[in-house]
């Protein structure tokens, strides 16, 4: 009996390893991963208006609109149908991607003493909350033409101490893809995101420029 068991053991081990190998094999196509870059934006201030530049700003983790909380690249079809590009994804989930882009854009503007991400341990003067309303390629016209990419943010800016709201504003951008190819669609996402982020940066800076002198006047009274 022991003799037969010793003969069967290598056979069973081989079958087990073959089974593991079959589970590890996948016929699914590889996922193409895409990312976007933050471009430098012009300063929104003037040489005699240093008030906002003396301030620090924290970018809170963005809130995601329905269907926008994953790393999938979203497209909209006719009849209000939401879908995703197969075999492709952003390098991070959409809120994390937007947070990174917003922080880099604000930092590159030179309008702030420091820009902190949501998880930074350092305190900040102001807090920016972004809600991602749109981040999609829109095919809803149903004409077969290349999609129009829409990027839209709803933003709330407030003082971090006391959470007093200073301003609420929208920032958006759109761009038509050059062709019905994913590379062209991603390029349109880049252009639309650049527009939205530039608007966000300039409006946030303007809001703090307005708020800081007003707060100083109120304390002086």
Where are these regions (language model features)?
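Bacterial N-terminal signal peptides that target proteins for export
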Residues: 1-10
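C-terminal motif of bacterial Sec signal peptides marking the signal peptidase cleavage site
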Residues: 16-19
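Surface-exposed short loop/turn segments
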Residues: 21-39, 43-44, 109-161
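A structural "domain/chain start" motif
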Residues: 21-95, 207-221
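Envelope-exposed proteins and targeting segments
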Residues: 53-55, 69-71, 78, 86, ...
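Solvent-exposed coil/turn segments that connect beta secondary-structure elements
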Residues: 62-64, 78-80, 133-135, 154-160, ...
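Short secondary-structure boundary motifs at beta->alpha junctions and helix caps
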Residues: 81-89, 161-202
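Sec-exported extracytoplasmic/periplasmic mature domains
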Residues: 103-111, 201-209
């Amino acid at each position: 009996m022991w003799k037969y068991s010793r003969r069967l053991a290598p056979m069973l081990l081989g079958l087990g390893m073959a089974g593991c190998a079959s589970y590890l094999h996948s016929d699914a196509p590889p996922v193409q991963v895409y990312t976007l870059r933050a471009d430098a934006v012009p300063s929104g201030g003037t040489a005699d208006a240093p008030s906002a530049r003396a301030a620090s700003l924290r970018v809170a983790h963005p809130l995601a609109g329905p269907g926008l909380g994953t790393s999938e690249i979203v497209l909209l079809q006719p009849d209000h149908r939401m879908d995703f590009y197969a075999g492709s994804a952003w390098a991070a989930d959409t809120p994390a991607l937007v947070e990174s882009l917003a922080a880099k854009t604000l930092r590159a503007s030179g309008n702030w003493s420091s820009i902190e991400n949501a998880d930074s341990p350092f305190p900040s003067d102001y807090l920016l909350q972004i809600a991602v309303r749109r981040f999609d390629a829109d095919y809803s016209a149903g004409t077969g033409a290349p999609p129009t990419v829409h990027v839209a943010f709803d933003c709330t800016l407030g003082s971090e101490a006391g959470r007093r709201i200073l301003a609420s504003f929208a920032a958006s951008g759109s761009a038509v893809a050059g062709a019905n190819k994913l590379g062209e669609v991603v390029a349109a996402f880049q252009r639309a995101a650049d527009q939205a982020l530039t608007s966000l940066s300039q409006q946030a800076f303007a809001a703090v420029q307005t708020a800081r002198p007003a707060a100083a006047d109120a304390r002086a009274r």
